[in-house]
C-alpha cells in the first residue's frame, strides 16, 4: 500500500503548479482565444444591427467564461507537465472548432458550436478533478459548483441549437446566467490561485483583445489607402494605445499588488472572481466593440456610421472606462470621477457620432481619451510615480486618483 502511495504522490505533484510565471503553453492556448475574439467581431460586422451586437456579445460572454475557467485551472495545474499538456492541446482543438463556428453560431453551425463548447468545458473539469483528488475542499467546489453550473449551461446551449428566434435567445441568456451566477450561488471557498500568475493572465488577455483592435484597422483598410484611411489608421492606433495606457500604466500594477496582499482563501478568491473573472469581461467586450467600430470606420472613412456601429465604437470605449471605475471600487474602494465622466460624455456623444463622418467621430474619441490621460498624468504625477517606482507607497497612491 505504501509503495502505491509513494508512486502516486510524485505523479500528482508533477502536475501541480509550482511557479507564478505564465508558461509558453498558456500563451499558446490564448492564441485560440485571439481567433475567437476575431470571429466575434466578424459576427457583429456581418450583422451591424442591435441584434447582431447582442449576438456577438452573448458569444463573447460564453467564450470568456470558458477562458476564465482555464485561468483558474492553470493557477492550480502546471499545463506543461504530464498528460495535462495533451488535454490542453485537445481543449485547444475544441476551442478552435468553437471559434470557427462562431459566425453562424445561432444558425447552421449552432449544434457544432454547442458540441465543441461542451468539449472545452469537459476537458476543463477533468483537469480540475485530477488536480483536486487529494484536496477535498477543491474537489467539492469542482463537483458541486463548477460541475453543476457547467452541465446546466452546456445543456442549455445544446437545446438552443435546436431552436431559433426568441426561444433561442432566451436559452442563451439563461445559460449565461447559470455560468456567471454559479460562483455567487456556490461561493468562492475551496478554490486555489496564485495571485501574480492570475493577474498576469488577465493582463495578457487584455493585450490580446487590444491586438484585435489593431487587426481590425488592417482589415478595415483593405482597399485604397488614401489620406483619410492613413489618418484614420493613426487615430485608431492612438485610441488603442490610450486604452492600453489607462490599464497598464497604474491600474494593473495596483490591482495585482492588491490581489497578492489579500488573505489566501475566501477573501482572495472573491477578489479574484469579482475583479478579474467578472470585471475584465466588460473591459474585453469594450475593446471588441471598439474594434468593430474601427473596422467599419476604416471601410467608410468619409461616411457616417450606422447607429449601432457608432454606439459600438463610443459605447464600447465607455464600457471599458466604466469597467475601470468598478474595478477600482472593488480593489481599493474609491471612485474615479474622471473616467466616469469621460464614459458618460462618450455615451452622450453617440447620436452625434452617428451623423458625423466616421473619421470625425474617431478623432473626437481619440481627443477625449488623450485629454483624460494627460489630465491624470499631470494631476496625479506624484501618486503615479509612487505606484510605478516605489511599491511601498502604492497603498496610499491609488485612492487619491
Predicted feature descriptions by range:
Residues 2-23, 27, 35, 44, ...:
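Predominantly late transmembrane helices and immediately cytosolic-facing juxtamembrane segments
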Residues 32-42, 357:
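Alpha-helical transmembrane segments of multi-pass membrane proteins
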Residues 45-50, 54:
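Extracellular/periplasmic helix-loop-helix junction of adjacent transmembrane segments
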Residues 109-113, 171, 361:
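Short hydrophobic/alpha-helical segments at membrane-entry points of transmembrane helices
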Residues 166-169, 358-367:
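Loop-to-transmembrane alpha-helix initiation sites
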Residues 330-334, 349-362:
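Membrane-helix boundary connector in multi-pass membrane proteins
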Residues 353, 367-377:
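Short, amphipathic C-terminal "tail helix"
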Residues 400-401:
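Acidic, carboxylate-rich catalytic segments that either coordinate divalent cations
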Amino acid at each position: 500500500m505504501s509503495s502505491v502511495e509513494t508512486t502516486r504522490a510524485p505523479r500528482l505533484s508533477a502536475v501541480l503548479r509550482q511557479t507564478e510565471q505564465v508558461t509558453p503553453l498558456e500563451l499558446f492556448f490564448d492564441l485560440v482565444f485571439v481567433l475567437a475574439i476575431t470571429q466575434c467581431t466578424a459576427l457583429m460586422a456581418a450583422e451591424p444591427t442591435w441584434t447582431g451586437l447582442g449576438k456577438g456579445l452573448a458569444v463573447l460572454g460564453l467564450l470568456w467564461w470558458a477562458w476564465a475557467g482555464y485561468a483558474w485551472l492553470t493557477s492550480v495545474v502546471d499545463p506543461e507537465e504530464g498528460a495535462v499538456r495533451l488535454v490542453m492541446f485537445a481543449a485547444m482543438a475544441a476551442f478552435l472548432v468553437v471559434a470557427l463556428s462562431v459566425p453562424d453560431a445561432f444558425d447552421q453551425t449552432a449544434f457544432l458550436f454547442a458540441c465543441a463548447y461542451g468539449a472545452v468545458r469537459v476537458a476543463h473539469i477533468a483537469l480540475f478533478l485530477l488536480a483536486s483528488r487529494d484536496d477535498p475542499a477543491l474537489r467539492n467546489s469542482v463537483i458541486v459548483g463548477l460541475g453543476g453550473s457547467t452541465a446546466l449551461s452546456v445543456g442549455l446551449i445544446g437545446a438552443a441549437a435546436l431552436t431559433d428566434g426568441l426561444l433561442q435567445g432566451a436559452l442563451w441568456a439563461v445559460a449565461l446566467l447559470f455560468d456567471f451566477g454559479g460562483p455567487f450561488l456556490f461561493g468562492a471557498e475551496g478554490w486555489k490561485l496564485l495571485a501574480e500568475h492570475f493577474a498576469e493572465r488577465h493582463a495578457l488577455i487584455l493585450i490580446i483583445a487590444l491586438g484585435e483592435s489593431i487587426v481590425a484597422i488592417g482589415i478595415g483598410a483593405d482597399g485604397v489607402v488614401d489620406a483619410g484611411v492613413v489618418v484614420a489608421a493613426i487615430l485608431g492606433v492612438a485610441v488603442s494605445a490610450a486604452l492600453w495606457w489607462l490599464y497598464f500604466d497604474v491600474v494593473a500594477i495596483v490591482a495585482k499588488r492588491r490581489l497578492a496582499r489579500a488573505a489566501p482563501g475566501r477573501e482572495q478568491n472573491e477578489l479574484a472572481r469579482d475583479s478579474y473573472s467578472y470585471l475584465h469581461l466588460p473591459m474585453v467586450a469594450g475593446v471588441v466593440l471598439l474594434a468593430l467600430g474601427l473596422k467599419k470606420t476604416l471601410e467608410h472613412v468619409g461616411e457616417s456610421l450606422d447607429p449601432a456601429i457608432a454606439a459600438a465604437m463610443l459605447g464600447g470605449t465607455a464600457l471599458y472606462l466604466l469597467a475601470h471605475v468598478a474595478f477600482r471600487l472593488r480593489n481599493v474602494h474609491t471612485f474615479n470621477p474622471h473616467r466616469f465622466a469621460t464614459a458618460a460624455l462618450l455615451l452622450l456623444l453617440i447620436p452625434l457620432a452617428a451623423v458625423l463622418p466616421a473619421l470625425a467621430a474617431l478623432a473626437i474619441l481619440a481627443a477625449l481619451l488623450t485629454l483624460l490621460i494627460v489630465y491624470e498624468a499631470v494631476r496625479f504625477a506624484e501618486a503615479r510615480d509612487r505606484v510605478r517606482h516605489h511599491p511601498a507607497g502604492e497603498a496610499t497612491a491609488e485612492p487619491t486618483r
